Curated annotation (Swiss-Prot):
Domain annotation Radical SAM core: ranges: 48-264
Annotated Gene Ontology cellular component terms: cytoplasm
Keywords: 4Fe-4S, Cytoplasm, Iron, Iron-sulfur, Metal-binding, S-adenosyl-L-methionine, Transferase
Organism (species): Caldicellulosiruptor saccharolyticus (strain ATCC 43494 / DSM 8903 / Tp8T 6331)
Positions of [4Fe-4S] cluster 1 binding: C36, C41, C47, S275
Pathway in which the depicted protein is active: Protein modification; protein lipoylation via endogenous pathway; protein N(6)-(lipoyl)lysine from octanoyl-[acyl-carrier-protein]: step 2/2
Catalysed transformations (reactions): [[Fe-S] cluster scaffold protein carrying a second [4Fe-4S](2+) cluster] + N(6)-octanoyl-L-lysyl-[protein] + 2 oxidized [2Fe-2S]-[ferredoxin] + 2 S-adenosyl-L-methionine + 4 H(+) = [[Fe-S] cluster scaffold protein] + N(6)-[(R)-dihydrolipoyl]-L-lysyl-[protein] + 4 Fe(3+) + 2 hydrogen sulfide + 2 5'-deoxyadenosine + 2 L-methionine + 2 reduced [2Fe-2S]-[ferredoxin]
EC number: 2.8.1.8
KW Amino-acid biosynthesis (keyword) present: no
Keyword hit for Iron: yes
Cofactor note: Binds 2 [4Fe-4S] clusters per subunit. One cluster is coordinated with 3 cysteines and an exchangeable S-adenosyl-L-methionine.
Protein's name according to its UniProt entry: Lipoyl synthase
């Protein structure tokens, strides 16, 4: 049964300040996109006020049509060859010690944009040698050569989200494949076990507790180090509906379970998103 009324624990107070305005202006001046803005993240004001952002590369138009996602779909733009330099400059201006880079899925590109990811990582590290870099990558259609391009650039954390339980893939992620997503994480770890791997999933889409715990076990079986779990919030009535608002106690239960089976870092709460407080992993890496 679909739920429509948000519970109190999902209500957040929006507080804009000078730091938020500075980040927004910088992004606009450099013609950069963030997933914070494109995906209507509920934590955008908190993160921007700390001068942190998750950069969205390869444009803001996705070639896939996942029913949960608010990023634009359609025919993507040409790849901006200057984007790696612009992002590296933004990282320097914002004085970031930890940066997250993600992208839309670009099935129209031969390597899915893997080389561009590598260029961004390398340029950030060239201009900001002390900055830790996390990349949240698409599945590259399982292309191991593409995955290797990203791994070879030596990100500190390589993340790929499974998003939901396998039973719900046909309706939530129809162009994706659960086993392929697990394989991305497995292959990346095998290519370079010095890189930490990470994944994330949303709950409230109609999954069961047992299914969530099975996904966590599957992630650990491929060597995944970090995991995030957050409440799914439907962007509009045209998107996949929220089936259930999960109580904070259940998120705590998932966190305890994930830690018990060996995850090194777990973020599990209603407003958690895959890049939320990602810099906390610096205590580990």
């Amino acid at each position: 049964m679909m739920q429509t009324k948000k519970p109190d624990w999902l209500r957040i107070r929006i507080k804009a300040n000078q730091s938020v305005e500075e980040v927004i202006k910088l992004l606009k001046d450099l013609s950069l996109h963030t997933v914070c803005q494109e995906a209507q993240c509920p934590n955008i004001f908190e993160c921007f006020s700390k001068k942190t952002a998750t950069f969205l590369i390869l444009g803001d138009v996705c070639t896939r049509n996942c029913t949960f996602c608010d990023v634009k779909k359609g025919k993507p733009q040409e790849v901006d060859k200057n984007e790696p330099k612009k992002i590296a400059e933004a990282v320097k201006v914002l004085n970031l010690s930890y940066v997250v880079v993600t992208s839309v899925t670009r099935d129209d590109l031969e390597d899915g944009g893997a080389e561009h990811f590598a260029n961004v990582i390398e340029k950030i590290k060239e201009l900001n040698p002390q900055t830790k870099v996390e990349v949240l990558i698409p599945d590259f259609n399982g292309d191991e050569k593409a995955i290797y391009k990203v791994v070879s650039a030596r990100p500190d954390v390589l993340s790929h989200n499974v998003e939901t339980v396998p039973r719900l893939y046909p309706t939530v992620r129809s162009k994706a494949d659960y086993e392929r997503s697990l394989s991305v994480l497995k292959v990346a770890k095998k290519m370079d076990n010095r890189i930490y791997t990470k994944s994330g999933l949303m709950v409230g889409l109609g999954e069961t507790k047992e299914e969530v715990k099975e996904v966590l076990k599957n992630l650990r079986s491929v060597g995944c180090d970090f995991v995030t779990i957050g409440q799914y919030l439907s962007p509009s009535k045209q998107h996949y509906p929220v089936i259930e608002y999960i109580h904070p106690n259940v998120f705590e239960e998932y966190k305890e379970y994930a830690i018990s089976i060996g995850f090194k870092h777990v973020m599990s709460a209603p407003l958690v998103r895959s890049s939320y407080l990602a810099e906390e992993t610096t205590k580990i890496i």
